[in-house]
C-alpha cells in the first residue's frame, strides 16, 4: 500500500455505514420475500383495479419468522444484521472466529458449507481476501435449498457471478439481492444483469444521507487530530 511504502500514517473510517448496510440487507430480503417492487408495478398497471377481490397477489409471499439466516462473517455489519434478524424472529447462524461463549445465545456457529446447505437466506459480511475470493461458487450454490436467497452487500468478487446466474436461471436457488458486483459500473455482459430473480442495487448500501454525514464528520475529526499531533484510528503505526 502507498501509505505503508511512504511511511505515511493511515487512519480508517470505521463503522460509519454499519446501520445503513444492515438496512440494505433487509431491503433486499423484504423486497424478495414480499415482492414489493413487482406488486407495486402491477398495481400501477391496473391489475388491482381490475381484480374482483379486495387484495391481489400473483407470487408467493414469504414470512421471515423462524427462517434460518446464515451470516458469512460476524463483524460490525454482520452483528447488526443479526440483531435485525432476531427482531424478525429468525434463527441466526454465523461463520465466525468467535467462540460459542463470546456469542449471544440467539446466534449459533456453523461452518461454511453447513450454512449454505441448511439456511434459507445467506448474507455475505466477510472481507475480500484470497481465501474468500469467489467463495460463492457452483459447488456451494449446489448445496443451497431451491427456495434459498443469497444477499451480497459485501464485495462483488466474493461471488462467481456466472455460477450465480446459472443457479438462478436453472432454479437451483430462488433469488439473489446484490449491492456490489465484480466490476463497477458493471460491464454490459455481466450475467447477473439478465439473470432470473436477481435484484441489483448500484452500490448504495453505504450511501444513506446519515452515513455520508457521519463519514465526513469522522474524516474531519481524523484530520483535526492528525494536525494536532494526536491522530485517531491509525492502522499503520
Where is each model-derived feature located?
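Glycine-rich Rossmann-fold phosphate-binding loop(s) that bind the pyrophosphate
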Residues: 74-75
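N-terminal Rossmann-fold NAD(P) dinucleotide-binding loop
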Residues: 78-79
